[in-house]
């Protein structure tokens, strides 16, 4: 009986993530570059989390945060004329709270995701595996999208990446030699 309950929870969470994914695509309608960005961050975050064998609740938080981590970008562009990381951290959490609440996400999940959004461009005092994996996934995508040098990749590898699989992917994507 317990297995059926767990399977039902997993199915419900997958459905919630799919609804969130579609809601984010709708939110970013017409901005294919940003849609591609959060889709790639989600893919890497999920891969790293699964390979690192995180528990299911942590995986759900990581996936939710990866889909919504840049939710404040358009608001920042409208309010400030730019969308730097600190501004995203400022504007994103309230937007995520509203969206996650509308989609029926539990309060504890929403609160952790809001925290991760509020800190995903802050690389000191990373206080959880979900935070670490989100930062690594975002770095993997940003390094490629921004065309950073091998020296910059190596610096990020040494200073930012902590998980075994985040490091592995970073090395293989960038062909850096450690």
Annotate each predicted stretch with a short phrase:
Residues 17-40, 72-82:
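Active-site flanking loop/helix segments enriched in acidic
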Residues 59-81, 92, 96, 114-121, ...:
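His-Asp-centered metal-binding catalytic motifs of divalent-metal-dependent phosphohydrolases/nucleases
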Residues 18, 42-43, 93-95, 111:
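A generic alpha-helix surface/boundary motif
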Residues 2-11, 26-39, 43-55, 68, ...:
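Divalent metal-dependent phosphate-bond-processing catalytic cores, especially two-metal-ion Mg2+/Mn2+ enzymes
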Residues 41, 87-102:
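An active-site-proximal "capping" alpha-helix that borders the catalytic cofactor pocket
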């Amino acid at each position: 009986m317990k297995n059926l309950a767990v399977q039902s929870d997993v199915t419900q969470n997958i459905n919630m993530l799919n609804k969130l994914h579609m809601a984010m695509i709708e939110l970013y309608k017409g901005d294919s570059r940003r849609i591609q960005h959060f889709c790639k961050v989600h893919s890497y975050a999920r891969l790293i989390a699964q390979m690192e064998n995180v528990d299911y609740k942590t995986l759900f938080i990581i996936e939710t945060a990866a889909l919504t981590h840049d939710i404040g970008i358009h608001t920042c562009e409208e309010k400030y004329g730019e969308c730097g990381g600190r501004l995203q951290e400022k504007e994103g959490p309230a937007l995520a709270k509203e969206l996650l609440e509308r989609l029926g996400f539990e309060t504890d999940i929403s609160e952790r995701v809001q925290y991760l959004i509020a800190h995903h461009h802050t690389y000191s005092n990373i206080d959880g595996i979900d935070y670490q994996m989100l930062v690594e996934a975002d770095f993997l995508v940003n390094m490629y999208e921004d065309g950073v040098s091998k020296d910059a990749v190596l610096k990020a590898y040494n200073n930012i990446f902590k998980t075994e699989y985040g490091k592995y992917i970073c090395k293989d994507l960038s062909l850096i030699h450690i």
